[in-house]
């Protein structure tokens, strides 16, 4: 049962990362000033 909990935790974390990546891409598309530096870094991270 403990193993299932770990799997669920990993799935939730991955889902959050994917959601975060999509929000990031939306912000970058809108060219938000605050995100401009982060967007430059974001290009190097293979989502």
From Swiss-Prot:
The keyword Methyltransferase does not apply. It comes from the Bacteria. One of its GO terms (cellular component) is plasma membrane. The chain crosses the membrane at residues 6-26. Keywords: Cell inner membrane, Cell membrane, Membrane, Transmembrane, Transmembrane helix. It is found in: Cell inner membrane. PhoP-regulated transcription is redox-sensitive, being activated when the periplasm becomes more reducing. MgrB acts between DsbA/DsbB and PhoP/PhoQ in this pathway. Represses PhoP/PhoQ signaling, possibly by binding to the periplasmic domain of PhoQ, altering its activity and that of downstream effector PhoP. Belongs to the MgrB family. This is PhoP/PhoQ regulator MgrB. The gene is mgrB.
